């Protein structure tokens, strides 16, 4: 399927005014959840990535439907001890400027808890929401506070306020960006 044949509204501002930028052929249909013992040949099919830009808000985005596992996106971003120290040094001025010590922070899509650990080390009361049970278990083994949820579901059930909201390596996978940000 090529861009020209697909009706599409911007994922951020919902404008129908989008410009086709480029179609990129030959990309894998999926990038995770492969079972090498029982290969699913449908996952190995290539697709065309249809890149467009919104004429109203400027967002560059894919017109393709989101992958079925967008709530359970696996990140390869691990943090070495040196990376954690560097991140702590980067975040410390923010924590101090906005008086976040002992204040509540939530990380959306907290993965294995790498960023939660850094927040905790800065004396921020960090809490994560994550959809992957495997990641939740790993985070809880580190004594981190993580619940199973996706942001749009979480806000409907909980009326909590946070002084800081963190979203690393996750926002770009959301199909309804505007709804997600408003949550």
Where are these regions (language model features)?
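Short, surface-exposed, polar/charged, turn-prone segments marking secondary-structure boundaries
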Residues: 38-39, 47-50, 79-83, 90, ...
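Short linear sequence motifs
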Residues: 20, 26-27, 63, 84, ...
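Fe-S ferredoxin-like electron-transfer domains
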Residues: 49-110, 115-122, 127
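Conserved SAM-binding loop
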Residues: 91-183
């Amino acid at each position: 399927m090529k861009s020209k044949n697909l009706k599409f509204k911007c994922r951020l501002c919902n404008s129908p005014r989008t410009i086709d930028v480029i179609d990129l052929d030959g990309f894998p249909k999926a990038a995770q959840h492969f079972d090498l013992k029982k290969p699913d040949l449908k996952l190995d099919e290539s697709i065309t990535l249809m890149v467009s830009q919104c004429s109203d808000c400027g967002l560059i985005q894919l017109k393709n439907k989101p992958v079925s596992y967008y709530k359970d996106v696996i990140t390869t971003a691990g943090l070495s001890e040196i990376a954690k120290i560097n991140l702590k040094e980067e975040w410390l001025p923010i924590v101090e400027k906005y008086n976040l010590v002992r204040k509540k922070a939530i990380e959306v899509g907290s993965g294995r808890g790498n960023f939660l650990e850094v927040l905790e080390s800065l004396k921020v009361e960090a809490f994560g929401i994550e959809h992957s049970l495997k990641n939740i278990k790993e985070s809880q083994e580190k004594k981190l506070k993580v619940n199973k949820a996706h942001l749009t579901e979480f806000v409907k059930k909980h009326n909590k306020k946070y002084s800081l909201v963190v979203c690393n390596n996750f926002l770009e996978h959301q199909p309804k960006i505007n709804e997600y940000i408003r949550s």
